[in-house]
């Protein structure tokens, strides 16, 4: 235990101090690893170091060593294996070694204990742990902390200390030379850069380096493949770096973003950039939109010139990585380091609880009898173990804010109409309505006309058409004003997205009551609720007149009986009260609203500017129409608004007590929006990823869209003016360019009969064809060989009538755009042609300009979805870019290939040579389409792995029954199944099904209802209550459950969830189901929770196949986390790992299509590179 106590103290020191220095023998293995990497192929030093550290006494691994060279080879092999894992991406490494992945969380410890129930009830009174379990868990925690310490020590060695761990394979390096000075500092900087090149950059695929100061200069024009020569050239270039004025980072970024093929950007900064961080952040985000680019910001020796927090904030804004290094204080921080430290703090906190638990009783069976722990375990997670922000319990740091306004009020002063920037306001002086009057002399109505198109007709806001005099300089000035207004609106949106406004929006009223949701479903988020309230008290409430806080669950708890004036003491008192809040009960929103309206705002008619801010995370206990009616009546006739701040906390967890009401996050948001509309307030919805919806931001966005619309109409006016000018100029030149002879030759009857040189059939096929004007261009019907050596007779090559018809069918798609005039020349044998309508460009002749894919996921099987949006249906097979098999090499009549064998690149596929018939542009379009389709496939796969679909799959039918196995073997899975079943009821059955029923089976079956029940809210709540009482016991009688389910009237689909085979014969079950299927067309979809039992899996597959259903096997947590990591990183590059094999039908079919799309994408990228190489190799023709 002393060892564990020592490690715990060491972790605390590391987490609280700024200098991360570790000592001891536990890091020797990583030191050996780094020494091996730095010494390259020198195997003597690693061997010597290993013996010195005492790590050479490893047990024999079965390999007999007979020579010293073999020992060195084994050590080198071992070093390479450990090197690959150590140099793994930090996120991947941490996900594989996290406490959750190693099952070292508090929930994992509690699951190993034995529950002791209170007599006569199902309430957990105690949880018992054996000494062996406690010691084993403590030992694993200590070992994990040591691994984290070793990882941190490794991250602070060699080049990683100064520059961090460089991610990516194709890296661009930006080096700030503004602060380079001669002397020891310059030599040390060059030395560190040399270490970075040798240790990390030498293992990359491509490199591009650029130095910048006032100006930017690169070593190479394009990214270079990493080789010994390029690395040597890079080292020589580093030695020549000289200081260059300022630090123009923006100019360097502009040069980098023009390059293609890079996946990592590293900026090594030595001083503060010339541009503000807001401008750099916006530019980086816009330039990297749609690109998978890893961004690193590294601060090197910039203590005096720039605080490291500047670039750290910039890196966080663009979701990149940061690394700060200060050799004076030996201080280095990075995102990788911070994540490791956070994990160590969690491990150390948990270790202290485990140690306290072990010392609480000396007996063999330790019993947790402390009331606090047992109560918190019963109610939810331990609050003391939840992560807290820095200085969470400290007193408030109160600021005095400005007088904020809602966006609607702000736009009354800064909107386009208020600034007189409405397009119709601007154009009104130069807009004239068309005049139309009746002329008595002419006895008809005469309309005014515009002289020589001097004005442009333009649709006005009321639907009428006006004549506009277009003044280009005036419109240019107006466009500049619109641009300034757009920038102002962007700054407003950015301001609304920062600090407490990101959570609460703008609190503008002078009298405020805040309602806090502390229901049991928010137990995991109590720290978040408290921190959000802290930000509000510090930043937005100090300039108010009165305020109060009300917390509500099943009951309400108020900080003060009524509103009190805002003061420093009252704000601090309110914060201390909030720190003691605990989550419990349901979500009684109506009681909290009644307390605020009827007590705090009892004299609401006598005051102005009053607001209620409801901070909640889910649907209330009461019906939304009731809340809407109550608030509409309460807010009517007075200046009182209800503003809702909704935070998304995920789906509610299943507990012994289900929530009073359930709704998805989208339905919850829609319900609260109705309440805010009825109460004249504002709606604000946010989550951990940002703001989802905000009325304040929507108002600004609407004004920006209006400005954009005005700008587009200005561009339309300018384009119309240019078109009119072009028409006037071109009208006089057009008759001169159009010869009259072309119109005469278009008449077939005036053609002179030529000499009978060409076969009659070919000539008559042209003469008698009434649509020959739409024929493709033919220069002559004379046959010409493809090469100089030809053994085919000219007669065989003459076009026949069938050949001409086939040619027209192939060009039918271009007939609408192309119109030709054919005629015979004086030579008689030749046919000439003249375009009457020119053909469109053929750059995309085999690829469509757009791919139609659904934005939202439709409820259907993967087989149906792939049939609609698969690669074959979208015509995206790679074979479409390939020509037929090349037979020119096999010709016996000639030795040379045809001419186009040298023109079109060829590839060998399965031993057959085929030509690539697409141009580089067509191949580029095809690759873009494939990447778009692949992203959509990945989105569909993520949808299938989310929510209740992960366990149950997708429910397709409208009248279904869920069969749930509750036998004794289901005990380990039952709690998870109950949670997912509640989610299934609300997420799929409530939304997509007309009627449903639930049926559990073990030795016998138990149905929720006798028949299918209509899907309503009340029915779903009753089903939830029924699910909570399910218990696992007995055997597995599947046949009886199926017979009962088939008896339900109008049943369309059955969903059978089990973990094994039936107690009876599998063939008997299949035969009985086959007989039932003959009478009723009911599909049975099977779900297996135990994929290791292959016999059970085969039985469930056959059962689903016989009935036309689908087999589904849920993905495990470990596999799911790996898949999520793959899908979020892009999953497009060839080096990315493949998807794991899926058992379920829906996942397997979609994964096969994804694999096929990735294969096509890699082949297309290879073909594109061949086409580019061939184009680069062709000699360029210059015109003199």
Curated annotation (Swiss-Prot):
- Cellular component GO terms held in the UniProt record: extracellular region
Which cell locations does it reside in? Secreted
Biased composition, class Polar residues, residue ranges: 50-62
Signal peptide stretch: 1-24
Q: Does the keyword Secreted apply?
A: yes
Key words of the record: Coiled coil, Glycoprotein, Repeat, Secreted, Signal
Q: Which InterPro entries match?
A: VWF_A (IPR002035), vWFA_dom_sf (IPR036465)
State the Gene3D superfamilies in the record: von Willebrand factor, type A domain
Q: Where does the record say carbohydrate is attached?
A: 709
Which stretches are annotated as coiled coil? 333-357
Stretches of Basic and acidic residues bias are at: 765-776
Q: Could you tell me which residue ranges the VWFA domain spans?
A: 511-708, 959-1131
One of this protein's Pfam families, by short name? Answer: VWA_3
Q: Does the keyword tRNA processing apply?
A: no
The protein's name: von Willebrand factor A domain-containing protein 3A
Q: Which organism is it from?
A: Homo sapiens
